[in-house]
């Protein structure tokens, strides 16, 4: 049970890991999931960062995809209808990203008017883009204002705010999201990290830094959840 959202089970595929579901469905029965969080989607399509974008570390993975996605039009007209047709019982959680308050509101509004979307995750914590993303999720005042506008655009659909761990204190951001009207929080996004290719003596990722995920960040995530 999540705030205003009932699931078959609590196994949820996190945003990004399964794209929009089509690729993952070739290897895995999506009906076994409690829900699928779609890849974070922006107003316009994005090619993402230069390659290589992903590398393995000793305790997880670094990625710097740079919000590569098909854009809101393709997501709502093609990707979500495919999921609804092939997995009609699977609750879909969309993920909205943007580079301004106006973009976030437009993306959320489109998702809110798309059949099959049961909740919307607000990604204000992507560490792999130059503007927007994490920049809007590190200032409590800015975040609270953004969440208020997004909640209005969501037309009653639950909003879960994905918080960045790349701050000194995550608690004020969680409070700002709550005060803005968020129904819940997603904790946490990846931690900014860097890996060196020992053969080339250069960063393993073309973007230099990337977001660290995997076993290494679980204790940090649990600590932040406890703080909140």
What are these regions (language model features)?
Residues 37-49, 117-126, 184-191:
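Non-cysteine beta-strand/loop elements that form the S-adenosyl-L-methionine
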Residues 61, 69, 127-139, 173-176, ...:
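Glycine/Thr-rich beta-alpha phosphate-binding loop at enzyme active sites
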Residues 1-92, 97-99:
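N-terminal capping/small domains of soluble enzymes
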Residues 72, 76-81, 104-112, 140-151, ...:
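Generic structural signal for well-ordered alpha-helices
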Residues 10-12, 35, 91-95, 117-121, ...:
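Structural preference for beta-strand elements that scaffold enzyme active sites
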Residues 28-29, 112-113, 178-181:
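Non-catalytic positions within long, well-ordered alpha-helices that form the structural scaffold/packing
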Residues 16-21, 95-107, 158-184:
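Active-site glycine- and acidic-residue-rich loops that bind
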Residues 109-153, 161-164:
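Metal-dependent enolase-superfamily TIM-barrel catalytic cores that perform enediolate-based chemistry
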